[in-house]
Each structure stands twice: as C-alpha cells, then as structure tokens.
Swiss-Prot record:
Location of region: Interactions with ADPRT/PARP1 and NCL: 1-102
Gene Ontology terms describing biological process: regulation of protein stability; single strand break repair
Subcellular location: Nucleus, Nucleoplasm; Nucleus, Nucleolus
Protein name, entry field: Aprataxin
EC number: 3.6.1.71, 3.6.1.72
UniProt domain FHA-like: residue ranges: 30-79
InterPro entries named among the record's database cross-references: FHA_2, FHA_APTX, Histidine_triad_CS, HIT-like, HIT-like_sf, SMAD_FHA_dom_sf, Znf-C2HE, Znf_C2H2_type
Renumbered residue ranges of the record's region Interaction with DNA substrate: 193-197, 255-256
Chain positions of motif Nuclear localization signal: 118-122
MF terms in GO: chromatin binding; damaged DNA binding; DNA 5'-adenosine monophosphate hydrolase activity; DNA-3'-diphospho-5'-guanosine diphosphatase; double-stranded DNA binding; double-stranded RNA binding; metal ion binding; phosphoglycolate phosphatase activity
Gene Ontology annotations for the cellular component aspect, listed alphabetically: chromatin; nucleolus; nucleoplasm
Amino acid sequence: MPEAVAKMRVCWLVRQDSRHQRIKLPHLEAVVIGRSPETKITDKKCSRQQVQLKAECNKGYVKVQQMGVNPTSIDSGVIGKDQEKKLLPGQVLHMVNGLYPYIVEFEEVAESPNLTQRKRKRSDCDSEEMEAESGTGLAPGSSPSQCSVSPKKDKNGATKKESLGHWSQGLKMSMKDPKMQVYKDDQVVVIKDKYPKARHHWLVLPWASISSLKVVTSEHLELLKHMHAVGEKVIADFAGSSKLRFRLGYHAIPSMSHVHLHVISQDFDSPCLKNKKHWNSFNTEYFLESQAVIKMVQEAGRVTVKDGTCELLKLPLRCHECQQLLPSIPQLKEHLRKHWGG
C-alpha cells in the first residue's frame, strides 16, 4: 500500500510590486521585518525593525505588531506603535506611511517520502548543533554557573528536543530586552550568550531579519564588516585589560534562525562547556572565522558550507593550543588550565 503523502501549511510574505523574493514566515515564529537589503527598503522613515510578524499557519492569519515609530497599516487602518492586528489573506499591509505593500499567502505543500527522509537526516544534524550551541542570550540575574537546562520529557520518559522555533523566539526576545543588551546601534545589538562557553562570550546580531548564512549575499557585506567591528569594540570595552585571546566567527550550521556572530575568549573556562559537541563547534572548521566569511562574500557573493560539516561535531577532543588529544571533557578542562595558568 503506498505511503500517504504528508502535507504542511506554509506562509509567505509577498511584496506586491515584486521588488524582492517572498519571505517565508515559519509557524508561530516571530520574524522582524523593516529597512534592510532583504526587503530592498532604504527609506529612513522605515525602521530596521518596523514590524514583527508571527504566522498562525493553522488558523490562516499573521499577527502584525508595529515596532517602528512611523505608522504601519492594514487596509488603510493604522496599527499603532506597539499594537498588534491580524493580517488575513486578501488584506494589504503597508510597511510604513502607506508605502511598500505586502500581502500574505498560505499554501499546502506536499512532502514526498524522499523529502521527509532528507528532512529527518537534516533534523539529526540540527539537533546535534542545537545541543552544541544551546544559547539565546543571558537571562536577567543569571550567571555562567547557571547553565543547566532540564530536558523536557514526555509521559514515557523520552527526552523532547527543543524546537528550532523556540530557540529563535528566545533569541529575538533577548535582542529586544534592554536588560540583555551589552551594546546596540541602528544596525546591530550585542547580548551575552545565555550559555557562555568561555569567560567572555557575546553574540552580535543584526536588527534586520536574516535567517542564516545561506541567505547572505554581497548586499550584506557592509553589515558583516560592521558586525565584526562591533565585536572588536565589545572586546576592547569589556575585556580590554584581559590578556585572553578572542575569536570572532559563525557556526556553519547554526541552531537558531537569525544570523549571529560569536565573540568568544579562548580560555573555554565555563561550566556550560559540557560535551564534545560544545567543544568541536568552536574548535574545528565548524566555526567559520568572521574575516573568512567576509572574504567569501566579497569574492563569491555568498557563503559556502562544505557537505558533511555536522560530522565535525563528532571528532575526538583535541586541545586548541597544543593539539594534544584528550579522552574526556573533565580531562580537557584540567589540561587547559596549564595553558592559561589557572
């Protein structure tokens, strides 16, 4: 008997004048849209974070929250600063001042058995990276010692993986929380990593909604350079007197769907660094140097990630200073103390 074809409902934000490609709005995930290379909007009256969109795919509408000062409207009705309205298919969203018209489209997408199998394989890699990264921004009042997150279990006792949408949601909430912010300007915000893997570990995030390195183009080049410069500024401002060495870079396959630059000291002295995947996500080619990413975009117009990259998370533990192999994380940490004199 043939296997039933699974279907899923997806939502798209579509610019009516077709100035750019449609933007996918994942189910129940907050997506911030505004002035950016992605939307092709350069009007300074449109904030870089003009609206927050959250698709209710099962119910067939999108919640729109106006975040910018200037008015966003749905069918000529102004939403209002920090207010929220529903956007239904057939209605027109004007991003700011009655300009830049958008509509939403919902469609049923059939998944073939082969696609489902590929997605399961990809999900395995995602869950490995999710465990490797596990960070969204430091919660108020927390400290590096507060790193444990109790895994959720179902009634049979099986551990449930946190969904990609949940992590992304937490990251975007952290970006907007003044208590989380270390630095911000009109292009980026810097927050502390919620689960720091070293004494100093920050995330530099653009306000513009850029889902991953996969969608980065030459149009984002200046933003990438600015993110790098801000990372160096944060090091100078908050660890300038430290003798610690730092690296700036991106995870090749991030667990959170919003581009973020890691700024991390190389002591790796943190109780949050708990397993091989944590270590290898920062100490193999899984970690893409910021300057290398910038060079790649300069020369090729995009970022290329090698096939099989997620397998790097399974490599043996190796000291990043002297290349000695260590059998376990506790022994690696003990070994690292010899390098930083702890």
